């Protein structure tokens, strides 16, 4: 949805790794959208960020999706980028249903629909911020209530 609204292309990290594509330059907008995995970045994302080079891009952002909390995903991305002398212009988060089923019950359709609805609202705000090139850290680290009002 972000690529569609910003008229940009969408690439997977796996494809970038397979194509040995770690440098992005002169892009109008460069963003990464990744899941939070056990309150952290997935290892493949952390390793990719360690090799990533962003040069002369108009606006850069990092977005993490999360179930219960973003944990340290945003701060990990920021720390890895800083280690390489780089930074994203903005950091965002969007709620999604947590899929770790031993703990989170996904059988309640109303609850899942509520999480998806909240996520769509957050994504709409994020897209607006991206379009206006808003800078800052907008990652929500609060523990999301698993019992939303229905």
Walk through the language-model features, giving the residues of each.
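FMN-binding flavodoxin-like domain, especially the glycine-rich phosphate-binding loop
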Residues: 2-20, 24-34, 38-150
């Amino acid at each position: 949805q972000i690529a569609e609204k910003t008229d940009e292309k969408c690439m997977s990290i796996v494809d970038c790794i397979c194509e040995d594509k770690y440098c992005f330059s002169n892009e109008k907008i460069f963003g990464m959208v990744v899941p939070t995995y056990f309150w952290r970045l997935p290892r493949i994302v952390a390793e990719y960020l360690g090799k990533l080079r962003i040069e002369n891009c108009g606006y850069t952002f990092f977005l993490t999706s999360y179930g219960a909390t973003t944990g340290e995903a945003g701060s990990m991305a920021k720390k890895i980028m800083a280690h390489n002398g780089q930074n994203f212009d903005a950091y965002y988060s969007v709620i999604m249903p947590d899929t770790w089923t031993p703990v989170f019950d996904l059988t309640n359709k109303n609850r899942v629909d509520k999480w998806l609805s909240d996520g769509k609202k957050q994504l709409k705000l994020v897209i607006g911020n991206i379009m206006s090139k808003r800078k800052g850290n907008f990652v929500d680290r609060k523990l999301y209530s698993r019992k939303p009002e229905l």
